[in-house]
């Protein structure tokens, strides 16, 4: 078995692919354009370079600045040994680091699992176990809850989990790392992974169901069609300002038209 064949098997394990006739129709109609989410934001950063992408408290990030941080975080992840197809659980509040972590992980072919701030041990440990996630990114504290305690429980019980990356104070717990100084990686870049827009980009979570949320695989192609169409329907443009109140990792907050739709239009 070739290395590429083995990688494809890993990437599609447990995933039901779109029927080929559907794929051909979506491509023919222009719904799917073969763009990855990573390349999507790179294009946004080129098109709207000096526009303000995010205001996070007192911090303002232009599109080009946000892309710079994404590139730097991708280098950091690569230097930690993460590879194409590795899973990462991201559980962060509505802060800039969420987008840096999300797009940085996608940049090297990792697959984020979009955990919400309200999730606790039962949910997070399930996400880690189901995907064999190697990395868990969380805040130190948010809304009175200490995520480091949750992370420690997961680290002790989930064999696949290699690292906990904390935005804030990591508490000097063994196996925990504080969010890196990204300026150390300014002059470095990663080699883009050998992935197509038809591959699974990340996993979102089912809503309204009973029990533990189910993982929903989203491909680059299918997700970006929703983003582009929603941005047009909502008539977003470069003058649009969006106050993000709902959890940023939620599907509605990301793509309906959400933050990604806003990026597509060049808004803030």
What function would you assign to each model-found segment?
Residues 49, 183-207, 212, 217-221, ...:
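Conserved pre-ATP/AMP-binding loop-to-beta segment of ANL
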């Amino acid at each position: 078995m070739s290395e590429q064949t083995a990688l494809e098997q890993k990437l599609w394990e447990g995933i039901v692919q779109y029927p080929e006739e559907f794929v051909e129709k979506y491509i023919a109609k222009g719904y799917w354009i073969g763009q990855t989410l990573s390349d999507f934001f790179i294009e946004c950063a080129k098109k709207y370079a000096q526009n303000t992408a995010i205001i996070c408290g007192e911090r303002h990030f232009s599109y080009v600045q946000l892309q710079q941080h994404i590139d730097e975080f991708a280098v950091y992840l690569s230097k930690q040994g993460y590879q194409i197809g590795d899973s990462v659980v991201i559980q962060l509040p509505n802060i800039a680091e969420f987008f840096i972590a999300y797009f940085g992980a996608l940049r090297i072919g990792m697959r984020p699992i979009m955990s919400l701030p309200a999730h606790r041990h039962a949910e997070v440990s399930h996400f880690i176990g189901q995907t064999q996630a190697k990395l868990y990114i969380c805040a130190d504290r948010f809304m009175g809850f200490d995520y480091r305690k949750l992370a420690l429980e997961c680290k002790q019980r989930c064999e696949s989990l290699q690292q906990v990356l904390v935005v804030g104070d990591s508490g000097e717990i063994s196996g925990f790392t504080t969010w890196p100084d990204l300026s150390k990686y300014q002059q470095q870049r990663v080699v883009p992974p050998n992935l197509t827009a038809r591959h699974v980009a990340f996993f979102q979570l089912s809503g309204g169901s009973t029990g533990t949320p189910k993982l929903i695989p989203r491909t680059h192609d299918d997700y970006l069609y929703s983003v582009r169409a929603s941005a047009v329907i909502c008539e977003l443009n470069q003058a649009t300002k969006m106050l993000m109140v709902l959890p940023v990792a939620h599907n509605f907050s990301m793509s309906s038209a959400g933050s990604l739709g806003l990026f597509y239009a060049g808004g803030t």
